């Protein structure tokens, strides 16, 4: 692995253990990243086992192509297409385990040219797949005040959303200013807009950068579709292992597993026959254990793991 691709997979042992790997099983790593989870799964598969990995980042695909293993297949695309890819390969209902490692990876954050980090100057891009969609810089030049405010508040949970949005709009409307195209420009703009009473330990731009990244990549919609797709293609007793990194992601995963574990709900106060109740179906999955967080040792080794949460479910 090249130096630029070095990456410490978060909750590696716990997430793979949660899949309960069968040597001859079929597995899907929905977020290849730099391959830490995929390589570990491959190391536990026998000759007849199969691993299919997915990623929409061209750099991740390039790294995946260095794996010369007949048991391994890489798919270039968003993980929301997991059900479609599984059906293409004749895997629907046959998959023994699916793993998702959500959010942005360390190599993406550390590569200034990708524009994900406010700590490094680079193009204000933030796209997971730079070949599709529009960069954040273009969106910020076109979006109105209300839209920018909504994105920061909804996806960054930033109480200063309106204040930051006003600063961005005021900046771009001043003809004397350079176009807003660099991460350092946006980070400074947000820092300057933060109230003097700002006392959070995090950088003032943390939440807004997260919000713009989530929005420009439609991350929450991707997660919702991917979770539903995974539940659809898993075989009975197949496992779903999901690592999230912020509260928006984790709430989605938690609610999904809870909903799938409860099954269809009978409307309160509406009389129904036993046959009608049975026709609604039953629970589709069950939660395996409680949410798992990284150990103190892992956090010391990899501080970025601090906010991670692992949840595991099993198809019934």
From Swiss-Prot:
EC number annotated for this UniProt entry: 2.1.1.199
Record GO cellular component, one term: cytoplasm
Cellular compartments annotated: Cytoplasm
Keywords assigned by UniProt, alphabetized: Cytoplasm, Methyltransferase, rRNA processing, S-adenosyl-L-methionine, Transferase
Catalytic activity: cytidine(1402) in 16S rRNA + S-adenosyl-L-methionine = N(4)-methylcytidine(1402) in 16S rRNA + S-adenosyl-L-homocysteine + H(+)
Keyword S-adenosyl-L-methionine included in the entry's annotation: yes
Keyword rRNA processing: yes
Gene Ontology terms, MF aspect: rRNA (cytosine-N4-)-methyltransferase activity
Cross-referenced InterPro entries: RsmH, SAM-dep_MeTrfase_MraW_recog, SAM-dependent_MTases_sf
Residue ranges that the Swiss-Prot or TrEMBL entry lists as coiled coil: none
Residues engaged in binding S-adenosyl-L-methionine: 35-37, 55, 79, 101, 108
GO biological process terms on file: rRNA base methylation
Family in the record: Belongs to the methyltransferase superfamily. RsmH family.
NCBIfam families membership: 16S rRNA (cytosine(1402)-N(4))-methyltransferase RsmH
Role this protein plays: Specifically methylates the N4 position of cytidine in position 1402 (C1402) of 16S rRNA.
Name used for this protein in its record: Ribosomal RNA small subunit methyltransferase H
């Amino acid at each position: 692995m090249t130096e630029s691709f070095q990456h410490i997979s978060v909750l590696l042992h716990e997430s793979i253990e949660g899949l309960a790997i069968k040597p001859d099983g079929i597995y899907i790593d929905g977020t290849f990243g730099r391959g830490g989870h995929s390589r570990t799964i491959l190391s536990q598969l026998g000759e007849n086992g199969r691993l299919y990995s997915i990623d929409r980042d061209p750099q991740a695909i390039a790294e995946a192509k260095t794996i010369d293993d007949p048991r391994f297949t890489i798919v270039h695309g968003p993980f929301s297409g997991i059900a479609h890819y599984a059906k293409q390969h004749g895997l629907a209902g046959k998959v023994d385990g699916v793993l998702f490692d959500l959010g942005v990876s360390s190599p993406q954050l550390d590569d200034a040219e990708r524009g994900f980090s406010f700590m490094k100057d680079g193009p204000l891009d933030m796209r997971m797949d730079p070949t599709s969609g529009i960069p954040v810089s273009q969106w910020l030049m076109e979006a109105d005040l209300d839209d920018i405010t909504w994105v920061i508040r909804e996806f960054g949970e930033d109480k200063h959303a309106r204040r930051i949005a006003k600063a961005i709009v005021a900046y771009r409307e001043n003809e004397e200013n350079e176009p807003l195209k660099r991460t350092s420009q946006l980070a400074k703009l947000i820092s300057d807009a933060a109230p003097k009473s700002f006392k959070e330990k995090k950088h003032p731009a943390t939440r807004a950068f997260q919000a713009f990244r989530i929005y420009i990549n439609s991350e929450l919609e991707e997660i919702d579709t991917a979770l539903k797709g995974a539940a659809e293609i898993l075989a009975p007793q197949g496992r779903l292992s999901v690592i999230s990194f912020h509260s928006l992601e984790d709430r989605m995963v938690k609610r999904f597993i809870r909903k799938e574990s409860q099954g269809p709900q009978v409307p309160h106060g509406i009389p129904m026959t036993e046959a009608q109740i049975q026709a609604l179906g039953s629970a589709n999955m069950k939660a395996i254990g409680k949410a798992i967080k990284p150990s103190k040792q892992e956090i010391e080794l990899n501080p970025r793991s601090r906010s991670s949460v692992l949840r595991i479910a099993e198809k019934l």
